[in-house]
């Protein structure tokens, strides 16, 4: 019979079945035992408690302002996009709580979202952060891997399978989730003219996405891949799934500016002259997206539009250190697990940002730069028992042959070490 610290455990502490009846198949800790069946029940109870925030208004649907405040903790800048997303997400889940209908029977259609902005500007992070705050399943799909049914590549239904996996197989929970489709601009039509050759990764994919984005009952192969006639499928209703599509849309700003310059309505000659290419997306219209290569029906399924600005040096410096989950804080805590403090020279932070700007990788490139910079140090530090502090210097950023300093013993008494970390948490813009 199982023992814990000399004490006999005779039965499951939850259902009362004896250890003998269970064939000894119990987990025991601190004198408490649980059988597999009770463990499964507990798991389901926890999942129900943690993953059903939308059952009633009393559960506290966050207001748009509360959602934006949460985004501010994790995402730097992009004020307009934060407001647009916060309102859209709030309205979407308010609609679900009301069962898609208002008191007089008016049916409220869902409003999917299109985000336009350069690589590394925060599109994916915004969607992911909102899903986490709403406590709903979240999945990311890459539009470039999708093809029209019957051709080599992924069927659009595989996007839904990712969401079902994120919901741990709970289809009803997945039906309230959020899907972010990245690189949506890559499925634009190759040109505006009708072609005799089939565009299976462009217009064909847009046509395939129409129904699931608008709302339909889809049949998803449980193992992914292509559907087979005699294979069992998972049925999922996409009516309440929020789709957020994002892409860089390189060249779209020129389309917008050309339209404005040709227009005789709404813009004075001075206003037209003052509209720069990098700000022209403020005036984005549906016709510009159609001109770019999205079909009208697809654009119509994405009625909420917002654009994200290209991040400047000040933005990237803040992204490094300010957000609650900033890259610098992540690495700081990673080193802290080895009882080593990570600090940065102020000039080193600026040099890291300069490199990201030079590579035109935006915020996404900051992590890869830091990973390369700290690679050798992360290899060495766990083997140095007296290591207390790692200092990232400007020279170590600029020169690949120079590693960050590893300080041991009494070397940590240098007064600037503590100040360095304060600087990297509270970066002085001046």
Curated annotation (Swiss-Prot):
ATP binds at residues 118-125. One of its GO terms (molecular function) is ATP binding. The gene is clpX. Residues 1-54 form the ClpX-type ZB domain. GO terms for biological process: cell division; proteolysis involved in protein catabolic process. The keyword Ion transport does not apply. Keywords: ATP-binding, Chaperone, Metal-binding, Nucleotide-binding, Zinc. Pfam families: AAA_2, ClpB_D2-small, zf-C4_ClpX. Zn(2+) binds at residues 12, 15, 35, 38. ATP-dependent specificity component of the Clp protease. It directs the protease to specific substrates. Can perform chaperone functions in the absence of ClpP. One of 8 loci used for multilocus sequence typing (MLST) in Borrelia burgdorferi. One of its GO terms (cellular component) is HslUV protease complex. HAMAP family: ClpX. SUPFAM superfamilies: P-loop containing nucleoside triphosphate hydrolases (SSF52540). Component of the ClpX-ClpP complex. Forms a hexameric ring that, in the presence of ATP, binds to fourteen ClpP subunits assembled into a disk-like structure with a central cavity, resembling the structure of eukaryotic proteasomes. NCBIfam families: clpX, PRK05342.1. This is ATP-dependent Clp protease ATP-binding subunit ClpX.
């Amino acid at each position: 019979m199982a023992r814990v610290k000399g004490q006999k455990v005779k039965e499951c502490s939850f259902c009362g079945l004896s250890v003998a009846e269970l064939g000894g198949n119990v987990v025991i800790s601190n004198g408490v035992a649980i059988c597999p069946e009770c463990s499964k029940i507990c798991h389901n109870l926890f999942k129900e408690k943690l993953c059903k925030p939308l059952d009633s208004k009393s559960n506290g649907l966050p207001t748009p302002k509360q959602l934006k405040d949460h985004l501010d903790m994790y995402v730097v800048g992009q004020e307009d996009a934060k407001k647009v997303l916060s309102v859209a997400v709030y309205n979407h889940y308010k609609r679900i709580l009301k069962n898609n209908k208002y008191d007089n029977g008016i049916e409220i259609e869902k409003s999917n979202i299109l985000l336009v902005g350069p690589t590394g500007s925060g599109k994916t992070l915004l969607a992911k952060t909102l899903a986490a705050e709403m406590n709903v399943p979240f999945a990311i799909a890459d539009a470039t891997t999708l093809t029209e049914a019957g051709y080599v590549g992924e069927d659009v239904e595989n996007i839904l399978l990712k969401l079902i996996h994120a919901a741990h197989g709970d289809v009803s929970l997945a039906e309230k989730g959020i899907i972010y489709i990245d690189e949506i601009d890559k499925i634009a039509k190759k040109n505006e003219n009708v072609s005799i050759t089939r565009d299976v990764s462009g217009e064909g994919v847009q046509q395939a996405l129409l129904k699931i984005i608008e709302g339909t009952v889809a049949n998803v192969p449980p193992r992914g891949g292509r559907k087979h006639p005699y294979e069992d499928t998972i049925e999922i209703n996409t009516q309440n799934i929020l789709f957020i599509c994002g892409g860089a849309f390189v060249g779209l700003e020129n389309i917008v500016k050309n339209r404005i310059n040709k227009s005789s309505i709404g813009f004075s000659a001075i206003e037209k002259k003052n509209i720069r290419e990098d700000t022209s997306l403020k005036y984005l219209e549906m016709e510009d997206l159609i001109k770019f290569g999205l079909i009208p029906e697809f654009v119509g399924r994405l009625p909420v539009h917002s654009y994200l600005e290209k991040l400047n040096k000040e933005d990237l410096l803040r992204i490094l250190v300010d957000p609650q989950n900033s890259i610098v804080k992540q690495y700081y805590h990673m080193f802290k697990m080895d009882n080593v403090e990570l600090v940065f020279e102020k000039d080193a932070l600026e040099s890291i940002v300069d490199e990201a700007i030079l590579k035109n990788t935006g915020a996404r490139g900051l992590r890869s730069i830091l990973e390369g910079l700290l690679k050798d140090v992360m290899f060495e530090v766990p083997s140095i028992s007296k290591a207390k502090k790692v200092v990232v210097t400007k020279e170590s950023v600029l020169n690949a042959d120079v590693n960050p300093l590893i300080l041991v013993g009494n070397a940590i008494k240098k007064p600037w070490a503590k100040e360095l970390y304060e600087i990297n948490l509270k970066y002085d813009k001046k």
